[in-house]
Amino acid sequence: MRTYDLKTGKKKIRWGRFCLIAVLLYIAALTIPYVQHKKVSDHYKKQFDPQECYSEEPGKERAAYITDNTEALEYRLKMIREAKEEVIVSTFDFNADTGGKDVMSALIEAAHRNVHVRLIVDGISGFLDMLGDPYFQALASTENIEVKVYNPVNLLKPWTMQARLHDKYVITDSSMYLLGGRNTTNLFLGDYGKHQNIDKEIFIYAKEGESASLKQLKAYFERVWELSDSKEYRCKKKTDRVQNSLKELEERYPKLEALYPDILKTWDWEARTVETAKVTLLSNPIEAKNKEPHMWYSVNQLLQTGKNAVICTPYIICGKEMYADLKNTCEQGTNVEIITNDVQAEPIRGVYRLLEPKRKNLGNRCAGARISGVSFQSYQSSAH
């Protein structure tokens, strides 16, 4: 953008206006690809049958509900310790803090036993936490360990920035997995800080070989792992810092055994779990772009199979399509209770205060749209 300077007779550039236009264009590239919500294809609608998620007979899979952060860390350490062939870890956020180093140490110990370890982390954490970090470099440099980053941050491709990997699970061999909302940080694992998220996870164990939902999860992981959006994270050079970090992580494991002696004992997995009829996992498309809302469609179909249903979520933001779906579900005869986090209980209160009007607006919109079957509760902690 140029203007004419009357004093000098020269043209000058109005950088402020130029920068403003550039910022607006960048924001447009960041948001416009996601403004128009995709519709669920007829192919997926025909493929998904909610009745296939149920069974009248007891299944092979057994489940446990993990709510305590220290117990969640112990489960990870024990599962990894017992692994003989393979460990798979997927997480949105992975920090090289105390809890994160505990998990790294366990993964390295497993790799030294010739267990194949694969770790995938979201690109935001890959950029903020892993880039150049000597502990993650040490992890990636270890034989039998592979690390990938899903959709790494690329400021030259803002249209990909909203596509994030929020999957959080641990799989060991073909017998068990842990899945839920816990990231691999002090906020979610162990008792290492003043502030903690009281989170929820499901542990699934199958005594008789690989279970149906475990096959689902492993197949899902393989698709994400092989995706072109998932990039390899490598240690380019084993510097002194990296070697010292590796030594620290290796020497950490005996201390973990002393700190968490239960992982040395034999665990009766059957006694720790309860019988289930059937476990089914649902997911959205995995590509780093605007996606068909397979999850929301599936959830609505499942809601309509019962008279009373509960949705537990840290927060909820509905578009017009979601309001219409909720109204339709309630008109089908289902009463829906939605439990969200209380904004005052959130560790990251600033973010959730921005979302609180959305939650209140959902209640008002449901009332305005006469969706009488929807009620709301606030959970007095932080759960995901």
Region locations from a protein language model:
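Charged, low-complexity intrinsically disordered terminal segments
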Residues: 2-145, 156-166, 172-384
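Lumenal/extracellular "mature" regions of secretory-pathway glycan-modifying transferases
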Residues: 148-150
